[in-house]
Amino acid sequence: MTVKTPVYLDYAATTTVDKRVAEKMIPYLTETFGNPASNSHAFGWEAEEAVEKARADIAALINADPKEIVFTSGATESDNLAIKGAANFYKTKGKHLITVKTEHKAVLDTMRELERQGFEVTYLGVQENGLIDLEELKAAIRDDTILVSVMWANNEIGVVQDIPAIGEICRERKIVFHVDAAQACGKVPVDVEAAKIDLLSMSAHKVYGPKGIGALYVRRKPRVRLEAQMHGGGHERGFRSGTLPTHQIVGMGEAFRIAKEELEQDMAHYRKLRDIFLKGIEGIEEVYINGDLEHRVPNNLNVSFNFVEGESLIMAVKELAVSSGSACTSASLEPSYVLRALGRNDELAHSSLRITFGRMTTEEEVQFAAELIKSKIGKLRELSPLWEMFKDGIDLNSIEWAAH
């Protein structure tokens, strides 16, 4: 089997722009170049029409009203606008916020910033499977709690939280509920009405759209208020000033339209690839799947291989584009904070690979990846004195290493 290498298996970091999306974008860079805010001539009207069509397509994927979609530069900005915007608007009602230890840095660092501004944040832990305990969430809610932020699907381990149940808890107590859905859109059904979500962050480049464009869903009924974080010409109903990049918005709209249309077949494709990969690595000993396999986006596998050094593993499989830890932070050699939150030890957290499949991934590529990983794990373990000791039945935890 000849597979063109390197094989891209890092679709949770970014996706290719679908050819249909790129084609749709090009005219808005050349011919239809007007500013959508120019309402006195045809160039502006045409651009505005394209923006509104995209807004409707994005809203359709998440079952929202187009008027509830606010364009941003991506999910990081959407997270910032949602969390800071809501916290600043509702701070007279209370200054307590709740989130989860395994959230994306865009949420965690925003929360840290609000702590510096005098807000109090509760960081919920997760169970071994990566899911939060709903009873723990209920217990954390106080009279002065104004916002809960929980991601739909985790960027590292792909675990899907019980968002409708959390939405129910928040709605009952009149608490604003924000969801980072960057990794969920186009991979699992997303319905803001059914899940009682107030604010939802989205990104185009995780859904075969262009980078640098995202959106924030802001509920109108019951209305959720935000304080703007970007000031200027009052674009996007005052929520987010700045000239709209028509070509990127058109790209995001088309990407979300295709995602809605092809969701079922995409999900089936991902499941098939996941099963092929799992079957391919079946024989390897001391393999740990990180995160719940049931409650999970179908295109994500995060696997730890005991007695293998993470960095040497990445180097050994250089024919594969995969990541260890989250791409935003994989430049640091710190073990993944998400895996640590699951209770994984440093060794297992270090030896993890995140393998994420995409629309363009083939069965042959996945077969190749599984076989390559299997053979490299074998070779690396042959070199490992720890593996040898483990195979000899020595309990490595009982060894007292000499301090140098």
UniProtKB/Swiss-Prot annotation:
EC number: 2.8.1.7
Residues binding pyridoxal 5'-phosphate, per UniProt: 75-76, 155, 183, 203-205, 243
A GO MF term: 2 iron, 2 sulfur cluster binding
Gene3D superfamilies: Aspartate Aminotransferase, domain 1 (3.90.1150.10), Type I PLP-dependent aspartate aminotransferase-like (Major domain) (3.40.640.10)
Catalysed reaction equations from the record: (sulfur carrier)-H + L-cysteine = (sulfur carrier)-SH + L-alanine
Domain of life from the UniProt record: Bacteria
Active site: 328
Cofactor: pyridoxal 5'-phosphate
Function: Master enzyme that delivers sulfur to a number of partners involved in Fe-S cluster assembly, tRNA modification or cofactor biosynthesis. Catalyzes the removal of elemental sulfur atoms from cysteine to produce alanine. Functions as a sulfur delivery protein for Fe-S cluster synthesis onto IscU, an Fe-S scaffold assembly protein, as well as other S acceptor proteins.
Subunit structure: Homodimer. Forms a heterotetramer with IscU, interacts with other sulfur acceptors.
Family under the similarity heading: Belongs to the class-V pyridoxal-phosphate-dependent aminotransferase family. NifS/IscS subfamily.
Protein name: Cysteine desulfurase IscS
Organism annotation: Neisseria meningitidis serogroup A / serotype 4A (strain DSM 15465 / Z2491)
